[in-house]
């Protein structure tokens, strides 16, 4: 339905300013259009975005045809933990199949619902008894018990608005022992010997090596909070931690001060792990074998164990 020009609010109308506010005008007519444009360009432009979407649909269809995973022994020490959801389930499927094919033996898998898994969880459960899914309701109940919002307001706020923090909270809060968390978009091409050896006998934290240091916060502040000098290039695409040793009060305090002094940042989770690992020796995945930014040549003809 068309409206007459007189019915359309004009920016010169004082009532328009009062009802919408200058801040909302700035958001609507500048920040949102500019943000959308920059997002499109970061993804290579509209044609690249369409091609990416076409390939995503092909990958989803291919994931539906993948066979079940071989059943592991119930007490197998080889267990991977992944956060996943509607946008990532097919990546998770290929990640797990590539691991089993490269490692040559079954793996137990624990998946953590990012809040969007309900409609696609059956696609992952059909891979058989190797898969255990932690539903959102179960995760929230555990967090409410071990990280109640009145005692951990910053961690719980970040849990709502910053899903990456869930790779720490959802996997480790209220649970003991070593766990290896990996990103859903990883693929394995050679036997992941380093990771298998760690899983069989974990005795220190594990992390990958980044292609570019990305902590999101200044080193002096992070060093002071950690009480130690951070190691360079810590990457959490592979992250092995012992939930029994995590001090959640300390993590809450770190988050609060980092955000109060230098605002929120996409790399907060990586910053926290870099601070945790600064105080102890770590198992560091060999950068040449576990790549975080493979070249086009490597992508087309993989020689590394993972990327």
Task: Give residue spans per PLM region.
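Catalytic core and acceptor-binding pocket of nucleotide-sugar-dependent glycosyltransferases
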Residues: 211-213, 229-307
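N-terminal anchoring/stem segment of glycosyltransferases
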Residues: 12-147
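GT-A fold catalytic core of metal-dependent nucleotide-sugar glycosyltransferases
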Residues: 163, 167-213
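N-terminal amphipathic/basic-hydrophobic helices that include classical n-h-c signal peptides
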Residues: 1-10
